């Protein structure tokens, strides 16, 4: 089994570095369903899963703490089908993602066989970087304390 180090690629992603390490440690590669993780900007992400043949009622999305879990269970076919070639996969799956702090699901929709899960990072204002203005007309602290002493 090949072991790829994805950490340089995932450093800029919010919360997905744990996913890469858990994928690297597992014995079975995650090959179903195929998915993309898109970064729209520093605070907006989208996970897209390709789920051809699934219906919206076959899918379940849960968030428990920092873990986002997507489950799919296709309804069993009522007809017995004899396949000459079967390239489409209709099997149950569970796919989990570890979300970073302050990252939450803002929307999920299923369209044309694609499940889109939108994520938003809402950092509280107290934790956001703050700009400090550099004053030009105020006296320095040493001068001010010398004036106060006299």
Swiss-Prot record:
PROSITE patterns, per the entry: SHSP
Ranges of residues in domain sHSP: 26-137
Main location: cytoplasm
Annotated GO biological process: protein stabilization
UniProt keyword terms in alphabetical order: Chaperone, Cytoplasm, Stress response
InterPro entries associated with the record: A-crystallin/Hsp20_dom, ACD_IbpA/B, HSP20-like_chaperone, HSP20_IbpB
One Gene Ontology term, aspect cellular component: cytoplasm
Subcellular location: Cytoplasm
Gene3D superfamilies: 2.60.40.790
Keyword Chaperone included in the entry's annotation: yes
This protein's record includes keyword Hydrolase: no
Pfam families to which the protein is assigned, alphabetical: HSP20
The protein's assembly and partners: Homodimer. Forms homomultimers of about 100-150 subunits at optimal growth temperatures. Conformation changes to oligomers at high temperatures or high ionic concentrations. The decrease in size of the multimers is accompanied by an increase in chaperone activity.
Function, as annotated: Associates with aggregated proteins, together with IbpA, to stabilize and protect them from irreversible denaturation and extensive proteolysis during heat shock and oxidative stress. Aggregated proteins bound to the IbpAB complex are more efficiently refolded and reactivated by the ATP-dependent chaperone systems ClpB and DnaK/DnaJ/GrpE. Its activity is ATP-independent.
Comment text on domains: The N- and C-terminal flexible termini are involved in oligomerization and in the binding of non-native substrate proteins, and are essential for chaperone activity.
Family: Belongs to the small heat shock protein (HSP20) family.
Protein name stated in the entry: Small heat shock protein IbpB
Species for this entry: Pectobacterium atrosepticum (strain SCRI 1043 / ATCC BAA-672) (Erwinia carotovora subsp. atroseptica)
Gene designation per UniProt: ibpB
């Amino acid at each position: 089994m090949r072991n790829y180090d994805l950490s340089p690629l995932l450093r800029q992603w919010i919360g997905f570095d744990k996913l890469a390490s858990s994928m690297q440690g597992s014995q079975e590669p995650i090959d179903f369903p195929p998915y993309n993780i898109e970064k729209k900007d520093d605070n907006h992400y989208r996970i897209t899963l390709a789920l051809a043949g699934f219906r919206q009622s076959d899918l379940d999305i849960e968030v428990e703490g920092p873990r986002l879990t997507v489950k799919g269970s296709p309804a069993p076919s009522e007809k017995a089908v004899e396949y000459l070639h079967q390239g489409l996969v209709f099997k149950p799956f569970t796919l989990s993602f570890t979300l970073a702090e302050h990252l939450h699901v803002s929307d999920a929709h299923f369209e044309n066989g694609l499940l889109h899960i939108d994520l938003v990072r809402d950092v509280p204002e107290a934790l956001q970087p703050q700009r400090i203005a550099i004053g030009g007309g105020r006296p320095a602290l040493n001068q001010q304390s010398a004036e106060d002493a006299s």
